[in-house]
Amino acid sequence: MHYCNNGNISNWKVFRRLWPIINPFKIGLIIASITLIINAVSDSLMLALLKPLLDEGFGKANRSIFMWMPLVLMGLMIMRGMSGFASTYCISWVSGKVVMHIRRLLFNHIMNMPVSFFIEQSTATLMSRITYDADQVASSSSGALITIIREGASVVGLCIMMFYYSWQLSLVLILIMPIISIIIKLVSNKFKDIGKKIQNSMSQLVNSVEQMLKGHKEVLIFGGQHLEQNRFNYLSNRMRQYTMKMVQTSSVFEPLIQFVASLALACVLYIASIPSVIEMLSAGTITVIFSSMIALMKPLKSLTNVSAQFQRGMVACQTLFTILDLKTEKNIGKFSVKRVKGHIIFDNVTFFYPETNTPSLCNINFNIESGKTIALVGRSGSGKSTIVNLLTRFYDVYQGRILLDGLNLNDYTLTSLREQVSVVTQNVYLFNDTIANNIAYARTRFYSRASIEEAAKMAYAMGFISKMKNGFDTIVGENGILLSNGQRQRIAIARALLRNCPILILDEATSSLDTESECIIYKSINILKKNRTSLIIAHRLSTIENADEILVVERGSIVERGIHVDLLNHKGVYSQLYKFQFS
């Protein structure tokens, strides 16, 4: 499920797809566009004041010009200031709304992606997409929009004014426009290519930081500081190089456009120096035209830069749409149930992980009666956790079927199915929230504090919770870093008790605990297992001796099954594992 950018998609197609996101806020865009045009027109009108000032005010000593000119100038400045404020506010409002909407779309889409997607994609890359890329879409596009409208209106306004006063001199502009258009077209492709490289470099840079932070203890214990530093230095330098390529291209581009514009300016000066032409023009007209051509330099420069800015936004937008095009979890089931009995059947189930040719499970068959306990044992990588992943529909079976209360697992809605299952794993994830909110995660509105406390008591968690200063309101830190492994496990068991699901899955729930903690945890687990269909994965075979049936999994197949005593007497794989563990 790898995703990539399709460089053949045109900017127009990308923008056309972005438009439905922008469309609800088009009122802000319309106001911003109008005020940007007003802002540009006010600049042009201020230049136009030079003609009456020079021809009438100084040339003919008309004092009335000096009386009304300051008032007009002040009015134009007020108009310019107010339109500038309105345009900036509206554009910021629209871009803020757009980036918020894109982030929400992306967040919700990623949250509903299948587990396989997260195995293939790094956390840092996805975080970069939601934060950096989403911001690039809004900031680059809004910045480009401001430039295109305001500077474009300035160019149009100045050109109209120049043609109005002397169309003969202004014809030179028509000659240079095709040249400028060709240059912009050629450089735009270069900007797009560099923009993609910058985006990918940023993602890799964030990934490097994430690995160092998550593996900080390993970095320290193995002395990997030099390795991580070199990796980060290389990636940050590559990011700098791509950024400099963008600057270099832009720096060459700008003078080239300005040189073409200066040629036009030189042509105007030359034409204006011809006696037959100069007789037709006043000092004010020459000044306005010449000043307008100089004033054109700034908007032309900005318009040449807008290509790089716009390309960054479109590249980021294309990447985000590529993710949004990926299919979320398949949820075609229609059946919803409040509470199942918990009768599970694996019927000739075969499963391949994506992009592998060897089956992880092959012809798996077993039956768990409602309220019974089945244990899965076997060496690491034998396929035990895969069975759990199929039961929770993190993956779908390749061949065969899984039945729950006689109904195919695929016929249940994902929400309804997962409401029937409580899972306690070896690596418990706790959110950076209170103990109470972690126990009642995603159900805080449905459970009272009394029921949360009761679940904690049954999970033997009250002992350490009551000793904490804030009790159930204690913040546990990121991934419960302020708690020990045993404490985190008891929180997870309390969470499972509170959910009170008919099916319980214990995946190596005690493998990382010391003996004392394990004894406490198993008191909780024995309470948790009552009247529930339980599926237990365990390396410590002493913990599953009382299971109703033990399945020995080897290379994706069930090679032995039975109760503890019978399997020991059978002198097979289970017996070997047991003897090896207790030798």
UniProtKB/Swiss-Prot annotation:
ABC transporter domain ranges (all copies): 344-580
A GO molecular function held by the record: ABC-type oligopeptide transporter activity
Segments crossing the lipid bilayer: 18-38, 65-85, 105-127, 143-163, 167-187, 252-272, 277-297
Gene Ontology CC annotations of this record: plasma membrane
Alphabetized InterPro entries for the sequence: AAA+_ATPase, ABC1_TM_dom, ABC1_TM_sf, ABC_transporter-like_ATP-bd, ABC_transpr_lipidA, P-loop_NTPase, Type_1_exporter
Cell location: Cell inner membrane
Catalyzed chemical reaction(s): ATP + H2O + lipid A-core oligosaccharideSide 1 = ADP + phosphate + lipid A-core oligosaccharideSide 2
Short name of any one Pfam family annotated for the protein: ABC_tran
Gene3D superfamilies tied to this protein: ABC transporter type 1, transmembrane domain, P-loop containing nucleotide triphosphate hydrolases
EC class: translocase
Keyword Nucleotide-binding appears in the UniProt entry: yes
PANTHER family documented for this protein: ATP-BINDING CASSETTE SUB-FAMILY B MEMBER 10, MITOCHONDRIAL, ATP-DEPENDENT PERMEASE MDL1, MITOCHONDRIAL
Quaternary structure note: Homodimer.
Purpose: Involved in lipopolysaccharide (LPS) biosynthesis. Translocates lipid A-core from the inner to the outer leaflet of the inner membrane. Transmembrane domains (TMD) form a pore in the inner membrane and the ATP-binding domain (NBD) is responsible for energy generation.
Protein name: ATP-dependent lipid A-core flippase
Organism in which the protein naturally occurs: Blochmanniella floridana
The organism's taxonomic lineage, starting at the top: Bacteria, Pseudomonadati, Pseudomonadota, Gammaproteobacteria, Enterobacterales
Annotated gene: msbA
